[in-house]
Structure formats: structure tokens, C-alpha cells
């Protein structure tokens, strides 16, 4: 399908695993065409801290270049995901559909689970803020070809 927004895996995760530790571009949200101001490194946050308070809800909280992700509880126990290949991720309390169907952030109702996206490709943001509708450049669109990555899931405990 042409013009996909993202291509990858989405799953629900136990809501008690709200501590997020990752090795990727950060510490702010970033996209393929919006990551020059971010650095590869290890960052820690919470699922709620990954939200961005946009005027209108939309996809948010993406991190590019993921190599390792730990989702843990306050006791330090949880899941560890190591990656191989291009992977981006987001961990939120909302689905994409939830965000597309609301006009204001206060209308969003948190899901009873964490919505985890692990994507092989995520469409860039593009730019329509300059008075002209400028689409996402082809280099930052989801390619129409076979995409693959490897994910290794293990349990993790406090180090």
C-alpha cells in the first residue's frame, strides 16, 4: 500500500511496566526527518513522560534508532527488547486510532495497557506550517519494499 504512516509491530503491554529505559535517539521525540537535534544515547523516562501535549492529539513520542528498550515496573523487573536493523518505538497509553478520533488532549482516555509500537519504518513528519502544504519528502516516507528487523525479548531485573 502506498503512503503508509508506519510499518511494524504494535502490542499491548502490562500497565505496571511504565518505567522506560532506552538506547536510541533522544531524549525528545524524534522522527526520520526530525532527529538532527537529538543524540544517540541511553535515556530514562516514564510512559506518561513520553507524551507530547499537542494542541490536537496525534502520533507522538516516537524514538528512532532503537538498539535496546527496557520496560519495567518500579521494582526494576520487566521486559528487555534488543534490536537489530532500523527500529523506532513509542510507548503510550493511547492507540493511534484514539488520538485520531479526539480533538483535544483532555478527551483522550488512557488504555488499561501500554501501547507499544516497534516499527521498521515510520513516516517523517513533513511540513505544512509554512503556509503551503509540503508533503513528506520521499526519503522520509515508508518505502514500498520488503522491510525486516530482529527483536530479542528477554526478562530483565534491576541491575
Model-based region annotation:
Residues 1-159:
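Beta-strand/loop-rich accessory regions of lumenal/periplasmic or secreted enzymes
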Amino acid at each position: 500500500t502506498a503512503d503508509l504512516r508506519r510499518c511494524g509491530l504494535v502490542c499491548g503491554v502490562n500497565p505496571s511496566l511504565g518505567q522506560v529505559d532506552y538506547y536510541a535517539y533522544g531524549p525528545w521525540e524524534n522522527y526520520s526527518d526530525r532527529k538532527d537535534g537529538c543524540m544517540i544515547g541511553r535515556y530514562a523516562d516514564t510512559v506518561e513522560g513520553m507524551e507530547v501535549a499537542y494542541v490536537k492529539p496525534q502520533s507522538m513520542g516516537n524514538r528512532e534508532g532503537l538498539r535496546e528498550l527496557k520496560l519495567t515496573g518500579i521494582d526494576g523487573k520487566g521486559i528487555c527488547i534488543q534490536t537489530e536493523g532500523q527500529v523506532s518505538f513509542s510507548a503510550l497509553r493511547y492507540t493511534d486510532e484514539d488520538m485520531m478520533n479526539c480533538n483535544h488532549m483532555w478527551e483522550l482516555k488512557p488504555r488499561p495497557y501500554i501501547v507499544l509500537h516497534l516499527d521498521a519504518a515510520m513516516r517523517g513528519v513533513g511540513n505544512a506550517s509554512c503556509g503551503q502544504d509540503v508533503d513528506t519528502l520521499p526519503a522520509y516516507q515508508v518505502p514500498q519494499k520488503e522491510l525486516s528487523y530482529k527483536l530479542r525479548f528477554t526478562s530483565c531485573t534491576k541491575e
